[in-house]
């Protein structure tokens, strides 16, 4: 961790670039190619980030001005679709976007501005179903005359009018894995607000302090990237990344989440009554926790907004209960309130939902950092994730196993289990004595974390799909016939 003295959450810079095949007219493997040609085509990549500058001006109260200027080049026909239409995401309830420039630059260097009819705002698809959590819009820019060798440039200013996390700034970025000629990230903060960074591949320039403010700058350049192997851990585990934060460590990060999550209405009589009704007749704490887990899992629809894309605090428990939907931190808040109502302790846990098995030395939100919340029950020594269907209480979905886990109440980094029990008893009987048709009978009994997956599969199946499942299992046994 590098402290600097005198994202914002998890955005991947330069847009989401479409992948493509190498240029069909490129030289065959092993053939020589002039150095200037190889550089100009991005080493076979369909798109090159020519220039990408992001400047953030942060105030003490969390208000923010962001200035972006980004130019992408289509190296071949496969890169045209990736740069011909670009997007600027913003939350219209919190932010204002001013488009400063939008133009196509042809191969001769002549700029062709985008007309007013090529710029429009559209509702982000995932926001349409959950307006309570986010009202995201995409400022869409459609560029004219894009062909192989041309570039598109977008420059905009985004102003955050309502700070999401007052007094805190954090930003996480990892490359989009397209060649980068030049990228600069600039953070202009009050001089008395230390900025901490975990930089891998990004070069930190000496900070400059003047007029009560400090300017931190990071530069990044990269040629063509190696192909990621199938089954590899997440790129953020070993690849380039930059995480900056005004919080020095995970204990401070946990305290900030803990303070923001305080809900005076968590012990509302309706919540307590529901918990007592659901656990009536159960004496053992584990049985009570299981009943509450099952109810939240079945009755609170999971709205998958990654932690860090919204204000890092759950909604009020009474609102979650009334709406019957919520994101991961809302699931944790409601489940925790129900547990507390029957005397069972719990605390939120922050971790990464994905194939990332380490966290940056600087705390932050993002795809390669923290982006999910689950629950820890210390008295039962169990983690629980109510957002995942088909996983019984006492077990975890594999996607959150063996991950660093930040316990919010204590501020301590722990780790979720690397393994969990599973078992299968299978018995097959084949009656081949009779003439003609051979009868086949199979008995399968699952135990452990996979058992509920099987139960859930058949529980949700229609009569027709049950027959289809049986026939599929017959084929998997290497037999031919009809179930």
Regions found by a protein language model. Name each.
Residues 250-323, 342:
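Secondary-structure boundary elements
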Residues 10-23:
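Bacterial N-terminal signal peptides
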Residues 1-12:
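Bacterial N-terminal signal peptides that target proteins for export
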Residues 2, 20-22, 152:
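Intrinsic disorder/low-complexity signature
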Residues 19-22, 109, 282, 296, ...:
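Hydrophobic alpha-helical elements and their junctions with loops/disorder across both membrane
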Residues 25-250, 270-271, 315, 319, ...:
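Beta-strand-rich, non-transmembrane domain signature
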């Amino acid at each position: 961790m590098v402290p600097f003295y005198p994202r914002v959450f998890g955005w991947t810079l330069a847009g989401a670039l479409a992948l493509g095949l190498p240029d069909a007219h490129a030289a065959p493997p092993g053939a020589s190619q002039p150095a200037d040609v190889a550089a100009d085509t991005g080493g076979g990549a369909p798109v090159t980030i020519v220039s990408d500058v992001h400047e953030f001006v942060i105030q003490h109260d969390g208000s923010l001005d962001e200035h972006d200027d980004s130019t992408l080049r289509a190296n071949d026909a496969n890169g045209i679709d990736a740069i011909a239409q670009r997007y600027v995401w913003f939350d219209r309830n919190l932010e204002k976007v001013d488009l400063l420039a939008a133009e196509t630059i042809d191969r001769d260097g002549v700029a062709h501005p985008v007309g007013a009819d090529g710029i429009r705002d559209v509702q982000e698809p995932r926001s349409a179903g959950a307006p309570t959590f986010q009202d995201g819009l995409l400022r869409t820019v459609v560029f004219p005359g894009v062909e192989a060798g041309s570039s598109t440039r977008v420059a905009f200013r985004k102003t955050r009018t309502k700070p999401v996390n007052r007094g805190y700034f954090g930003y996480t970025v990892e490359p989009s894995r397209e060649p980068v000629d030049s990228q600069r990230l600039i953070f202009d903060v009050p001089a008395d607000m230390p900025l901490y960074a975990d930089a891998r591949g990004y070069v930190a320039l000496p900070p400059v302090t003047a007029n009560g403010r400090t300017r931190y700058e990071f530069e990044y350049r990269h040629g063509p990237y190696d192909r990621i192997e199938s089954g590899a851990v997440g790129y953020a585990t070993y690849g380039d990344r930059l995480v900056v934060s005004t919080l020095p460590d995970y204990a401070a990060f946990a305290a900030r989440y803990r303070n923001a999550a305080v809900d005076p209405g968590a012990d509302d009589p309706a919540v307590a009554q529901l918990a007592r009704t659901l656990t009536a007749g159960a004496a053992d704490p584990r049985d009570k926790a299981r009943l509450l887990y099952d109810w939240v899992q079945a009755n609170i629809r999971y709205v998958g907004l990654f932690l860090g894309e919204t204000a890092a605090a759950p909604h009020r428990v009474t609102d979650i209960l009334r709406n019957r939907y919520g994101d991961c931190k809302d699931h944790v808040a409601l489940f925790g309130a129900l547990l507390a109502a029957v005397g069972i302790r719990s605390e939120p846990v922050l971790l990464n939902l994905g194939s990332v098995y380490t966290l940056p030395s600087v705390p932050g939100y993002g795809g390669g950092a923290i982006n999910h919340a689950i629950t820890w029950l210390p008295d039962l020594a169990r983690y629980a994730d109510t957002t995942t269907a088909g996983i019984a209480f006492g077990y975890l979905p594999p996607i959150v196993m063996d991950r660093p886990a930040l316990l919010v109440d204590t501020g301590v980094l722990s780790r979720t289990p690397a393994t969990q029990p599973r078992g299968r008893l299978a018995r097959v009987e084949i009656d081949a004595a009779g003439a003609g048709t051979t009868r086949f009978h199979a008995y399968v009994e699952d135990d452990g974390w996979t058992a509920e997956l099987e139960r859930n599969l058949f529980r949700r199946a229609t009569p027709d799909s049950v027959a289809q499942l049986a026939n599929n299992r017959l084929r998997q046994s290497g037999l031919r016939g009809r179930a």
